[in-house]
Amino acid sequence: MNSRRLIATLVYCGWVLLLALGIHAPQGAAGQVVSGMYKVTETTDLGTQVRVTLQIRLMNAGEDTIFVTQARLRGFPHSGRSEDKPAHVILEPHGSSEFTQEFTLAKQEYELWSKGARPHLGLNVQVGGGAATTITIPLMQRPGLR
């Protein structure tokens, strides 16, 4: 009985930590105006890892054009173990853009998605003609798709 209580406490603490990290995710200049959705289009089982192809839609609610140069699927908690993938996406003011990207991640992490965990996407962006910065956004699953 004690081991069950310990496991439950550890799981609860882990979820609290994930929630806290999600709330305090690093935000750049474009962090408040960029949001994203994803759809899994293909998966390949690689043993302890999974190769996932995502169709990603980014939305820009701001007044400036945003140039996305690289995308990285962030781990839980934001481990940053994923490699940077080139992404040549232009987000016009109040516009959106879709692109497809392939990522390799731990199978355990991928399985968390089906339990409600949201993947986070690290983006290298340039807003207007300004300096390059990095933002991290949570991706929402596109309704009814998977």
Sequence positions of predicted segments:
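Bacterial N-terminal signal peptides
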Residues: 11-20
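Low-complexity, acidic Ser/Thr/Pro/Gly-rich terminal tails and inter-domain linkers that flank the onset
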Residues: 26-48
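Solvent-exposed, conformationally flexible loop/turn segments
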Residues: 47-49, 93-96, 130
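Short, solvent-exposed loop/turn segments enriched in Ser/Thr/Gly
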Residues: 48-55, 116-119
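Asparagine-centered strand-capping/turn motif at beta-strand->loop junctions
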Residues: 58-62
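Short acidic, flexible loop segments centered on an aromatic residue
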Residues: 63-79
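Short, solvent-exposed, Trp/other aromatic-anchored flexible loops in extracytoplasmic proteins
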Residues: 83-120
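Terminal connector regions
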Residues: 107-146
